[in-house]
Amino acid sequence: MKIDKKSLKRIVKVLLNKVPKEEAALIKVSDDLTLIQEIYRKDKDFRNFILNPSAPYEDKKKIIDSLSEKAGLDPVVKEALEYIVKTNKGNLLKIIGDEFRFEVEKFFATVKGEIITAYPIDEETINSVKEVVEKKLGKKVEFDIKQDPSIIGGIIVKAGSYILDSSLKTYLQKLEQQLTAF
């Protein structure tokens, strides 16, 4: 089922207008939407039920009420979920968290990123990478630091649309492609 981008943007805009423009409130709604998105992606039964047009809205609403209560969802998120389900646009749940987070990042002029290394790195290195990326993007960047021994060495930096992969693993893969091309 194709994603209706127009509806997605409209729903995200309504959410942004209903949520107080305070960092804590926006982060709470963003986290709630990300949780819903993850449940939608990982729980096949939930996804199939939400997408089933012949399932009565009242039954879907009961699931939303239960989920909202258990997860402590913000009332604005619950209201948006009910609207999405009522209008049979359940497939929007696949990306609504990403879209909302993108709009919040634009609002705060911040970008979420990640630094991936094979081994632990010190604060000084993190700060220098952060400084370079912020200068390049012209926005504040908040990095999650991850370790992935499979990259062997080097660093991978992702922030918004900016990706720098100087890992040894990627270098070796490119070298292998060049050598086997002959």
UniProtKB/Swiss-Prot annotation:
Pfam families: OSCP
GO cellular component, one term: proton-transporting ATP synthase complex
Membrane topology (UniProt): Peripheral membrane protein
GO molecular function: proton-transporting ATP synthase activity, rotational mechanism
First-listed, main subcellular location of the protein, grouped into a coarse class: membrane
Keyword set, alphabetical order: ATP synthesis, Cell inner membrane, Cell membrane, CF(1), Hydrogen ion transport, Ion transport, Membrane, Transport
Localization of this protein: Cell inner membrane
Keyword Ion transport annotated: yes
Quaternary structure (record): F-type ATPases have 2 components, F(1) - the catalytic core - and F(0) - the membrane proton channel. F(1) has five subunits: alpha(3), beta(3), gamma(1), delta(1), epsilon(1). F(0) has three main subunits: a(1), b(2) and c(10-14). The alpha and beta chains form an alternating ring which encloses part of the gamma chain. F(1) is attached to F(0) by a central stalk formed by the gamma and epsilon chains, while a peripheral stalk is formed by the delta and b chains.
Chain's role: F(1)F(0) ATP synthase produces ATP from ADP in the presence of a proton or sodium gradient. F-type ATPases consist of two structural domains, F(1) containing the extramembraneous catalytic core and F(0) containing the membrane proton channel, linked together by a central stalk and a peripheral stalk. During catalysis, ATP synthesis in the catalytic domain of F(1) is coupled via a rotary mechanism of the central stalk subunits to proton translocation. This protein is part of the stalk that links CF(0) to CF(1). It either transmits conformational changes from CF(0) to CF(1) or is implicated in proton conduction.
Assigned protein family: Belongs to the ATPase delta chain family.
PANTHER family xref list: ATP SYNTHASE DELTA CHAIN (PTHR11910)
HAMAP family in UniProt: ATP_synth_delta_bact
Name under which the protein is recorded: ATP synthase subunit delta
Organism: Persephonella marina (strain DSM 14350 / EX-H1)
Gene: atpH
